[in-house]
């Protein structure tokens, strides 16, 4: 025969069976009112959702003719903020293409050297040693002349700068002399003017 259950055991057994977790919204009236008055936090989408029929049509068009590319925007149209760059003092950033050197139209020396050096690749095919040495000698001469011209340009620039500084110094010197002469003239005029006689009183 099974042992007899106590009343407390029976009560706990029945309680465990019927226990349920009920939400406060259903049990508490004030909580229910709070939920009812709560505004919609998520904004309603401004873009209208397409119907299934329209979407199907669009998909069919894409399959037939391909998808259209969206509008391409330039960088200045996108309003991208420009970042602050660190400026290194005394270093000027080079502009333009890297390693690009422009040749003047009247610079026949450089142009002829370039033409000769470019034609090298095609002349090598059938030329004698004598022709090759002559061509290389011409190239060397042209390069030498170019270097001499560059040196001359540097010297001219230096001389020009020197003369400019000398002229500036001489102009400053002449200005100083003029100012000194003018000041001396004013002083002389002031001394030449007769001073007014002042009455002197003597006490015996």
Curated annotation (Swiss-Prot):
<feature type="compositionally biased region" description="Basic and acidic residues">
    <location>
        <begin position="148"/>
        <end position="167"/>
    </location>
</feature>
<feature type="coiled-coil region">
    <location>
        <begin position="121"/>
        <end position="178"/>
    </location>
</feature>
<dbReference type="GO" id="GO:0051028">
    <property type="term" value="P:mRNA transport"/>
</dbReference>
<keyword id="KW-0813">Transport</keyword>
<feature type="compositionally biased region" description="Basic residues">
    <location>
        <begin position="174"/>
        <end position="183"/>
    </location>
</feature>
<dbReference type="GO" id="GO:0005730">
    <property type="term" value="C:nucleolus"/>
</dbReference>
<comment type="subunit">
    <text>Component of the 66S pre-ribosomal particle.</text>
</comment>
<feature type="region of interest" description="Disordered">
    <location>
        <begin position="1"/>
        <end position="52"/>
    </location>
</feature>
<comment type="function">
    <text>Required for efficient assembly and nuclear export of the 60S ribosomal subunit.</text>
</comment>
<feature type="compositionally biased region" description="Basic and acidic residues">
    <location>
        <begin position="184"/>
        <end position="195"/>
    </location>
</feature>
<dbReference type="GO" id="GO:0030687">
    <property type="term" value="C:preribosome, large subunit precursor"/>
</dbReference>
<feature type="compositionally biased region" description="Basic residues">
    <location>
        <begin position="7"/>
        <end position="16"/>
    </location>
</feature>
<dbReference type="GO" id="GO:0008298">
    <property type="term" value="P:intracellular mRNA localization"/>
</dbReference>
<comment type="similarity">
    <text>Belongs to the LOC1 family.</text>
</comment>
<dbReference type="InterPro" id="IPR037650">
    <property type="entry name" value="Loc1"/>
</dbReference>
<keyword id="KW-0175">Coiled coil</keyword>
<protein>
    <recommendedName>
        <fullName>60S ribosomal subunit assembly/export protein LOC1</fullName>
    </recommendedName>
</protein>
<keyword id="KW-0539">Nucleus</keyword>
<feature type="region of interest" description="Disordered">
    <location>
        <begin position="148"/>
        <end position="204"/>
    </location>
</feature>
<dbReference type="GO" id="GO:0042273">
    <property type="term" value="P:ribosomal large subunit biogenesis"/>
</dbReference>
<keyword id="KW-0690">Ribosome biogenesis</keyword>
<keyword id="KW-0509">mRNA transport</keyword>
<dbReference type="GO" id="GO:0003729">
    <property type="term" value="F:mRNA binding"/>
</dbReference>
């Amino acid at each position: 025969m099974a042992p007899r259950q106590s009343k407390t055991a029976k009560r706990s057994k029945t309680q465990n069976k019927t226990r349920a977790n009920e939400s406060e919204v259903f049990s508490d009236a004030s909580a229910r009112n709070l939920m009812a008055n709560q505004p919609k936090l998520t904004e309603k989408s401004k873009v209208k959702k397409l119907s299934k029929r329209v979407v199907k049509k669009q998909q069919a068009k894409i399959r037939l003719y391909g998808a259209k590319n969206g509008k391409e925007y330039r960088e200045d149209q996108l309003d991208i903020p420009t970042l602050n760059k660190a400026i290194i003092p005394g270093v000027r950033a080079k502009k333009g293409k890297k390693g690009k050197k422009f040749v003047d139209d009247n610079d026949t020396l450089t142009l002829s050297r370039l033409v000769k050096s470019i034609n090298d690749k095609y002349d090598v095919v059938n030329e004698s040693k004598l022709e090759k040495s002559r061509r290389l000698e011409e190239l060397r001469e042209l390069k030498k002349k170019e270097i001499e011209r560059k040196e001359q340009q540097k010297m001219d620039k230096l001389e020009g700068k020197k003369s400019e500084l000398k002229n500036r110094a001489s102009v400053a010197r002449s200005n100083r002399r003029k100012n000194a002469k003018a000041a001396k003239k004013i002083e002389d005029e002031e001394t030449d003017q007769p001073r007014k006689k002042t009455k002197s009183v003597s006490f015996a």
